[in-house]
Curated annotation (Swiss-Prot):
It comes from Synechococcus elongatus (strain ATCC 33912 / PCC 7942 / FACHB-805). The gene is purA. GO terms for biological process: 'de novo' AMP biosynthetic process; IMP metabolic process. Its main location: cytoplasm. SUPFAM superfamilies: P-loop containing nucleoside triphosphate hydrolases. This is Adenylosuccinate synthetase.
Length: 444
């Protein structure tokens, strides 16, 4: 038995969906523990490309129980749309469970999110406009609507009548927007409640029962470490905790049940939205990475900013999450490059800095210190074993492992399931994989 957390080691969009999908074959339970429809993950199965925002990647395996945990915020309309899409494709959602204590994104959350971002002007933070921040704000202010509240018609009417009256004042006085009709919202969300009811459970109890039966549990994070509310590039962050520690709170489990943390990172770096990005590339190479990597957001369709691999934020992610091993994705995107640069440290006002600075202002002033390594100038998308990789590609992976000081367990070379090198099974294998320490580049 192994209970594993999968987290993003960069700014999100690292390819966690594919990695979670691969690992779900060995998992009995998959738990999404934070975030909402602001995060999207893409899974390619044969000729089908599935884009999901709330439903865990494990939904494709009928024997894998999929849980949307209490740390998430749920837009019922989007969730039910995903359920319908999957069922139209012949994929059952009978094994989907929803935490009764997860909070619900309401229409006023979306309106306030979009209006607030627009008011920021040049100081915008890059929100998706899906209402995530305001939903988490209401959760913190103890005025939010939870899934279990949807299941109580009389209580829901009472709550929403009061809440919408308050929100209408904000919409009118602060943003100049027309009021919401409380009766229409109550009717709409009461309808959602009946459709969701068969899936609603006490998720913490369900997870505990699985753990006591020694089931394999996979905890799936959304976004990435550098978007974490407490540990990311604040204020250009999300409103929840994507880091590994967030799995315990968002799923309702104790830290002692976590056996392993897998960090997912691209072979380069991307970021969507606003905020500092030291290794960002603006020329031809940045455009090549964007086009070859299809770097457009699953949720918003926004173009992702692209840059070289940043080992400083990588080491920070290892430290914050206690990462045991890495999954490196999109190695094939680098196939055509003559040489590749890796940021090994920063220069801040003439001083070398090997660690991630907490201040956004300091981070914005960081100049990357690069080490240049040779490219391999040949396709890697067909490789299925380490021995199949060009020597320069293998050397690149070794270099990343040395810089991050953790082993590499998985290498992804394309969107399809089979375009993957499994160096070591992160769930059932020992904690070794590709490990390089003290400058030793031999596999252990």
């Amino acid at each position: 038995m192994a209970n594993v957390v999968v987290i993003g080691a960069q700014w999100g969009d690292e390819g966690k969906g594919k990695i979670t999908d691969l690992l779900s074959r060995s998992a009995d339970v998959v738990v999404r523990y934070q975030g909402g429809v602001n995060a999207g993950h893409t899974v390619v199965v044969g000729e089908q490309t599935l884009k999901l925002h709330l439903i865990p990647s494990g939904i494709l395996y009928p024997d894998t129980q999929c849980i949307i945990g209490s740390g998430t915020v749920i837009d019922p309309k989007v969730l039910l749309g995903e359920v319908e899409m999957l069922e139209q494709l012949g994929i059952s959602t009978d094994h989907l469970l929803i935490s009764q204590t997860a909070h619900v994104t309401m229409p006023y959350h979306r309106l306030i999110d979009q209006a607030s971002e627009q008011q920021r002007g040049s100081h915008k933070i890059g929100t998706t406009g899906r209402g995530i921040g305001p939903t988490y704000a209401d959760k913190s202010e103890r005025t939010g609507i939870r899934i279990l509240d949807l299941m109580d018609p009389e209580g829901l009417r009472e709550q929403l009548t009061w809440t919408i009256a308050q929100k209408n004042v904000i919409l009118d006085k602060l943003y100049g927007l027309p009021p919401l009709d409380a009766e229409s919202v109550i009717e709409e969300y009461s309808g959602y409640a009946e459709r969701l009811r068969p899936h609603v459970v006490d998720s913490s109890l369900t997870i505990d029962e699985a753990w006591r039966k020694r089931k394999n549990i996979l905890f799936e994070g959304a976004q990435g470490t550098l978007l974490d509310l407490d540990h990311g590039t604040y204020p250009y962050v999300t409103s929840s905790n994507p880091v590994a520690g967030g799995a315990c709170i968002g799923a309702g489990v104790g830290p002692t049940i976590i056996d392993r943390v897998i960090g997912v990172a691209k072979a380069y770096t991307t970021r969507v939205g606003e905020g500092p990005f030291p290794t960002e590339l603006h020329g031809d190479i940045g455009e090549l990475l964007c086009q070859r990597g299809a770097e457009f957001g699953t949720t918003t369709g926004r173009r992702r900013r692209c840059g070289w691999f940043d080992a400083v934020i990588g080491r920070y992610a290892v430290r914050i999450n206690g990462i045991d091993c890495l999954a490196i994705t999109k190695l094939d995107v680098l196939d055509d490059l003559d040489e590749i640069q890796v940021c090994v440290a920063y220069d801040i006002d003439g001083e070398r800095c090997d660690h991630f600075p907490s201040s956004a202002r300091s981070f914005a002033n960081c100049q990357p210190i690069y080490k240049t390594v040779p490219g391999w100038k040949q396709s890697t998308s067909h490789c299925r074993n380490l021995e199949d990789l060009p020597k320069a590609a293998l050397d690149y992976l070794k270099f990343l492992a040395e810089l991050m000081e953790v082993p590499i367990a998985i290498v992804s070379l394309g969107a399809s399931r089979d375009q993957t090198i499994i160096v070591e099974d992160p769930i059932h294998g020992p904690k070794r994989a590709l490990l390089y320490t003290n400058g030793d580049s031999s596999a252990s």
